[in-house]
């Protein structure tokens, strides 16, 4: 077969090597002999041509005398390219060249397209260079193909530059070129440039269509700019562009997520009036949005309307609703929805099961959560890392850290990789159970496995070390964190300052507190409370009062903890008048005495250090 493709004055091995490198021609055998001439076969149409038929036709054309024109070969190559057999096309082009059939600009554009589709832009530009060298002038189609090639490789800036070059060369970009570039810009998040390009399209004399606007709307909605998306939607209307149900659904979903339900419902009613029928995605977005906003009856009504219109809710619809019910603490309704989807023959997916397992765990129904987990596995639905993390977290909260650890070890055997959240959950569980060594070992395992600890991970470990009397170890880690130039929020500093105060190192805590402004970190109410508490514990009541005043001057509003700490400190220091003043100020601010303050007052009443009227003042 290969021999028949080779001109008499060439060696078989050369062409065979080319075909082996550029195509998979040699893998096809048993090619049937053509009964029709190549002209008849081309005339009869070669849409969706099969590989073997294409090779057979190419052989027939090569054997014909006189040889077919480049136009005939281009028709074949173009048809094969549409079937995405790019290597085969390039092999045909090489075969043409070997048989003395010159490539014209159309042939070379086909080759450029194939190389672009294969993400081999260097080869594409090599063909373009050859075209220029042969005196051919690339047309809009050639340039559009290269623009698409740049976009496929994510090289959008170069695609933009090429379009600008086209304009300079008096080659006007066509609608496909500009739409391709707009899509590429949107994929890179460069929406503002895409919008400018749409306006430029009008200058080029093109009318943008729904395909042009689609990527821009999608990107705006994904980035949470639903207001801008709605504005663009209105602009489409002004330009008499009819939006599709997909585009309506995208904008409606974005508006629902932003809480703009009135706008979402208005758009929904608008599409209905225009005769555009809502689909399962449209309804799912609206139902989920209404339920998220607590409008359960409206959501249920829309679900009934959806079913009444024979738009069957899919697993995505049910899963979204179940998740909303679980988050709102409506586990009973979530279970009813689950039963409904089973009745309708809709198989739950991992997201569905995860939501229900999470719901059971939040209600402290660990037994039911495990039953749902077992059911999930029995139905052939594989648990993911989220499933395991939910259960591990629930075990840890129930003080069953060892069970959580057993489940954690099961993760690896299932081929799953624990993430930062999974490790954080277990490290916290061990710390809260007082199993500090286990927490430290797990932290080291996390690091050795290449799972990067987050600031939250470090915070959990530092807090555990401080609470269990290992301040020095906590300070070692804290120092390493500072040297690593990790961005430390006020939460980390609060843990260390609190640990220092608990270890009676109030002066060290004060030094760290005073250095916060130099580090560009602003103290919050917790920082002030911890520091005021430390000063009170040390007996430095005047310094605590000064810090309380500074706290208010700096615009940090005291909370009930602040007042209760100071009230107890003043009562313990025989500062009855100042205690009364603080109580009155606290009540004006809408706070009340906590259990520790009330207990202290009752104790002082019992040994007659306070009058009963003081207790009445607290109420």
Swiss-Prot record:
Q: What is its main location?
A: mitochondrion
What Pfam families is this protein classified in? Answer: PPR (PF01535), PPR_1 (PF12854), PPR_2 (PF13041)
Q: Which InterPro entries match?
A: Mito_RNA-Proc/Resp (IPR051240), Pentatricopeptide_rpt (IPR002885), TPR-like_helical_dom_sf (IPR011990)
Gene3D superfamilies membership = Tetratricopeptide repeat domain
> Which residue ranges contain the repeat PPR?
69-103, 104-138, 139-173, 174-208, 209-243, 244-278, 279-313, 314-348, 349-383, 384-418, 419-453, 454-488, 489-523, 524-558, 559-593
Transit peptide location = 1-28
Q: Which domain of life is it from?
A: Eukaryota
User: What GO CC annotations are associated with the protein?
Assistant: mitochondrion
Q: List the disulfide bonds.
A: none
Per UniProt, the keywords (alphabetical) are: Mitochondrion, Repeat, Transit peptide
Location in the cell reads: Mitochondrion
Q: Which family does it belong to?
A: Belongs to the PPR family. P subfamily.
NCBIfam families cross-referenced by the UniProt entry: PPR
- Recorded protein name is Pentatricopeptide repeat-containing protein At3g22470, mitochondrial
